[in-house]
A protein has these predicted regions:
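Alpha/beta-hydrolase
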Residues: 180-257, 264
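Short beta-strand/loop motif that positions the catalytic acidic residue
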Residues: 262, 268-270
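Conserved HGGG/HGGXW glycine-rich cap/lid loop of the alpha/beta-hydrolase fold
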Residues: 38-94
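Conserved hydrolase catalytic core segment
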Residues: 122-165
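Active-site loop/oxyanion-hole signature of alpha/beta-hydrolase fold enzymes
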Residues: 86-127, 131
């Protein structure tokens, strides 16, 4: 009788374990907006009740694919993490409603995603890269009570300062003849000219976006760039790679005066060759109340790829101290 009881108990435990382990990691989350309900795509990897990282991709309008490098590091450290395509991005709905492409919308979208995934202040670590860093900061300024920590990767707290750095520092590092030609296209706002795009791709990207020859870019990165939602990108970021210009909605974004409001553990990740000023990224870590700075000496804007060892060693160390 006892043997049968324990046999039955073992079977129940085994079946419950199988059910948990085989649970579908993909979750489609309904997002409610003033323009109706839409679905966004998420995918969970791992299981850790105290360390759950939600990844906010850049763009705006890119997707989760360039984060797949995390698969080579986080599972070994037992860090649970979530891929998430923001509304308008590849695997999520694309309602093509311009009123939704705002910081305010995306902050509330992240909050709805958090609730659906069951994340809370005891486990919720938010990591935003580039535009995702803007979104992460804005989310934390409104909802930091829900966060365990915030990680801002390769983003500064001021777009006007970013514009100044791009125009007066990085641009001047280009060959003068190349820069003259680039600026001739920008002067007439000919941002879609094939030669302009080639000049940027051949001369700017390999130095400051990802320091890997374009022909050798990882497929996950190439796919993320190829699938970017340009209407969102153009509305929020604008057409130029030398800062945010024109009528782009992020042009005047600046939270330098608000950083001191952030009390949660905060990691700023910068890189020597980034499109963003590494000095500003370090300064940001000193402005918040509980900040840390990680420098990637060999990296650029995609430091998780071109300085991966420094990037992930520092990132994982920060997460493990929480």
């Amino acid at each position: 009788m006892i043997n049968k009881f324990f046999l039955a108990l073992i079977c129940v435990i085994f079946l419950n374990s199988c059910e948990f382990n085989n649970a579908d990691p993909i979750k489609i989350i309904k997002i409610t907006t003033e323009h109706g309900d839409f679905n966004v795509w998420t995918k969970r990897t791992g299981n850790n009740p105290t360390k759950k990282v939600l990844l906010l991709h850049g763009g705006p309008g890119a997707n989760h694919q360039y984060f797949k490098i995390f698969d080579s590091y986080f599972p070994n450290e037992n860090i649970e993490y979530y891929y998430y395509d923001q509304l308008g991005s590849t695997l999520s709905d694309n309602p093509q409603i311009e009123d939704l492409w705002t910081i305010e919308h995306y902050v509330e979208e992240v909050e709805q995603v958090r609730k659906s995934l069951g994340l809370n202040k005891d486990n919720f670590i938010l990591l935003g890269h580039s535009w995702g860093g803007i979104l992460g900061i804005e989310y934390a300024l409104k909802y930091q009570k829900n966060l365990k920590a915030l990680i801002v990767s390769n983003m500064v707290p001021s777009v006007p300062d970013y514009n100044n750095y791009a125009k007066n520092v990085l641009a001047l590092q280009l060959d003068p003849n190349i820069l003259k030609e680039i600026r001739s296209y920008e002067a007439v706002q000919d941002y879609t000219n094939e030669n302009y795009l080639k000049l940027i791709h051949d001369n700017y990207y390999p130095k400051h976006v990802m320091r890997i020859p374009a022909a050798n870019w990882p497929e996950d990165v190439s796919n993320a760039f190829a699938e970017i939602n340009f209407p969102i990108y153009l509305k929020m970021q604008g057409p130029s790679e030398f800062g945010i210009v024109g009528d782009a909605s992020l042009k005047n974004w600046d939270v330098t005066e608000d950083l001191k409001k952030l009390e949660i553990p905060f990691l700023s990740i910068g890189a020597k060759y980034d499109t963003m000023d590494p000095i500003q990224m370090e300064w940001m870590a000193n402005e918040v109340q509980n900040g840390f700075y990680l420098n990637c000496p060999n990296g650029s804007h995609m430091a998780m790829w071109d300085d991966k060892e420094n990037y992930f060693a520092g990132l994982i160390n920060f997460i493990n101290t929480l």
